[in-house]
């Protein structure tokens, strides 16, 4: 059963999408119709294999997925999963697994700024025995 088929049975109006599907999120998100994507006011997804952005195929796949999401939604929070160590390439630190929260742009007035302290203290390590993975500064957009 596809997400499109599931949504056919949902009541009219906004939906929330939460996904942790072990790397299949890219295929699912690029296959969604524009109308269904716009129905999701909130989207929470754990993206896998983010360290593959350094390969040509990985970059093209991820770029297409994120460009599509960012047309209609804004990133409001990112939580690195500390289960796997970050990968360092070209001076960039990339946690291979990160949970992103998106909010549909037409649902709030200022899509250019979400205070980072709005969720401070709400994140917990996915693996308590391992040290946390900080989100590198380059992944955080500062409001002007």
Residue ranges and their predicted role:
Residues 17-24:
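Switch II (G3) loop of P-loop NTPases
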Residues 2-13, 49-144:
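Rossmann-like AdoMet/SAM-dependent catalytic core
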Residues 1-2, 20:
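Conserved acidic residues
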Residues 15, 27-64:
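A short alpha/beta connector and helix-capping loop motif
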Residues 3, 25-27:
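Short, well-ordered alpha-helical microsegments
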């Amino acid at each position: 059963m596809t997400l499109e088929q599931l949504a056919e049975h949902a009541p009219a109006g906004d939906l929330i999408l939460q996904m942790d599907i072990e790397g299949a999120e890219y295929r699912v998100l690029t296959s969604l119709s524009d109308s269904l994507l716009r129905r999701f006011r909130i989207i929470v997804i754990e993206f896998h294999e983010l360290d593959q952005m350094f390969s040509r195929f990985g970059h093209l796949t991820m770029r297409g997925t994120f460009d599509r999401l960012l047309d209609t939604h804004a990133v409001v929070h990112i939580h690195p999963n500390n289960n796997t160590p970050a990968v360092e390439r070209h001076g960039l630190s990339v946690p291979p697994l990160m949970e992103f929260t998106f909010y549909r742009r037409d649902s709030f007035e200022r899509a250019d700024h979400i205070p980072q302290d709005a969720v401070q203290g709400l994140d917990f390590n996915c693996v308590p025995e391992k040290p946390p993975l900080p989100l590198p500064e380059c992944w955080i957009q500062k409001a002007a």
